[in-house]
Amino acid sequence: MHVAVIGSGYVGLVAGACLAETGNDVICVDKDAEKIRRLQQNEIPIYEPGLEPMVRRNQEEGRLTFTTDLPAAVRAARVVFIAVGTPPGEDGSADLQHVLAVAREIGRNMNDSKVVVTKSTVPVGTAEKVRAAVRCETQQPFAVCSNPEFLKEGAAIEDFMKPDRVVIGVDDEEARAVMGELYAPFTRQGGNRVLFMDIASAEVTKYAANAMLATRISFMNQMARFCELVGADVNNVRLGIGSDQRIGRAFLYPGPGYGGSCFPKDVKAIIHTADALGLSLDVLKAVEDVNEAQKRVVLHKTIKYLGKDLSGKSVGIWGLAFKAETDDMRESPTIPLINGLLETGARVQTHDPKATDSARAIFGDRVMYCADPYSAAHGADALLVMTEWLVYRNPDFERVRKLLRRPLLIDGRNLYDPDRMTALGFEYHGIGRSRR
């Protein structure tokens, strides 16, 4: 099938590469000429495991091309995905100007029947706005679908190729058949993995899914703080409640708060949409409040044990990205942590396997970027673990302890066993793991 993907950012690039992998002829479009030039040279602007070889392979085999020529891509396609950004406004609402501008451009270049698919994360009602924008520019027949993505950064290729489910909002039988054919190769492992539904429900599903996951994270982070007060270990509590099949163990890990490009933005957007309709989503507002407070927990622990004035003190940080297996620093809990440390006068030395360039764009030369974890620990008065990269899970702890000026280890991801760390000579403090 001939497919155009408008927007070659994270979602568009992954979708385009995976659709090409199953034999479709895919054209990925972006207005950024330099990005397109780099993609044509197989230079991937983001870190995502498995993406670079997939892009390279499909370009070499002629199924995947990159261009700035949106009109030509639209004319060549049967299905056109809109995968441009929807950045949040100051009030938390999703900015649809790029989505609707692309929709109008699609309409102006429509030469036969097309299926126009919103892949971007958009609020309920957007598909109707897209339909109106396209209709203003063409008399050609077309259908509009909603096909939200459910990709986890760091596992996006696996998520797309072997999805838990594919949600498709559609109100046209021909479009339903086209989308079913397009996704058939990804759902042959059995089960009813393609969920066709009305468009509004598909649009809500994306926001509801991310809001639920964010809620679980904030719930466990609040339980972690409670555990510290009563002398319990949140890890034991996590195992105890996660063993209940009604609850399950996914997304029950306490930490420094959620971040990234999805959860913060999507929770704000659904709250804003509901507020505009006269409904206050009080649970999700509490989820946001808990998360903002949680982002300060590691900083507060550092100040508690090192003092309010950190002038002359060095703090090592392992992990900058908001999660492992990505270079994404958007809304990372490490950002307010580092800003807080700098405000108190600390010298900050950091390490991350992939996110150093992203961090440098934020902090410039105000922090030190180390080539390996041990350099970040060298001479530090405290070591803070902020991202659950594999490289941090089992280092040479004796070497780390000797490198530290003071063996203060604040484990923001609960990677380590408290008793073992204490036996190794560390002053260990986790999240929700009382040492009383």
Predicted regions and their residues:
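Structural/interface elements that position substrates and couple domains in central-metabolism enzymes
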Residues: M1-R436
